[in-house]
Amino acid sequence: MSQSLFRGSGVALVTPMTPDGIDFPALEQLIEWHIASGTDALILCATTGEGATLTYAERAEIIERSIRQVNGRVPVIVGTGSNNTASAIALSREACAAGADGVLVVTPYYNKATQRGLVRHFTAVADAVDRPLIVYNVPSRTGVSCTAETYAALAQHPNIVGVKEASGSFALIQETLNLCGDGFSVWSGNDEDTAAVCALGGAGVISVAANIVPREMHRLVELCFADRILEAGREQLRLAPLIRALFCEVNPIPIKSAMARMGLCSDVLRLPLCEMSEENRARLFAAMDACGVSA
């Protein structure tokens, strides 16, 4: 690895929708709000952005509009993963051609590749682009997890700069940091693990919660980077009930419900995702109130 991308709190941005398509005015407002709130990077069209149910034309327009609007103020990273290596290459090339600062590539889902296959997959994608690539490890969704040895092999590639680690395994994170050293960044892929990952030497978080508490997530990582670990721990604990509520149903269902309550965007989702149950919505709203989260 020879390129850096960002250090801090990146938001895994939702894709605002209407029943008829993408809500671009809401997306524009969200981007400005995040930049003003200290968000360090924008991650588009990934899990939280419902990338799996966007059309090719929608993806292209979201990427092009967002990059033009951001105009270099923060890095824009695009989710380009697929369980088909050729598709991941094509999506990554298109994002880079549009001006993305980097790509986020999830481990191939459903196929359940071997570790050797994972190395070949990510290497093929990284070979095809001239921008930084972040591996995204989320075995709860994909059915496969990278090992620290796989990360160590991938870290030798000049374009592979780190991993968004959402396995929840601190043993894996520690082993990865030990094996890969400072040249390979580890971002927490779970909001609840942010302070702990940063305290171990992680580069920050790619956050769902930042969609509604961007300033708080930015402050959390900054406290860690300033070695104010006890303060960071207290802030992590304060946010913990809200973070748990944001995952009482599968992401991004709760975060869109929270954002709709705040007037940030609608809670429109695309099937097979659907609206929250009333019971879970009440739980989420109570957690928001307890944490002082409002429009």
How does the language model describe each region?
Residues 3-143:
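Active-site beta->alpha loop and helix N-cap motifs at the rims of alpha/beta catalytic domains
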Residues 5-16, 37-39, 199-202, 206-295:
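C-terminal alpha-helical cap/extension of soluble enzyme domains
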Residues 19, 24, 56, 148, ...:
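Alpha-helix N-capping/helix-start residues
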Residues 27, 59, 63, 88, ...:
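A general structural signal for well-ordered alpha-helical segments in protein cores
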Residues 28-31, 148, 281-288:
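Short, amphipathic alpha-helical "lid/cap" segments that border enzyme active or binding sites
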Residues 61, 65-70, 94, 98, ...:
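Alpha-helical structural signal in soluble globular domains
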Residues 127-128, 139-247:
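Catalytic alpha/beta core domains of metabolic enzymes, predominantly
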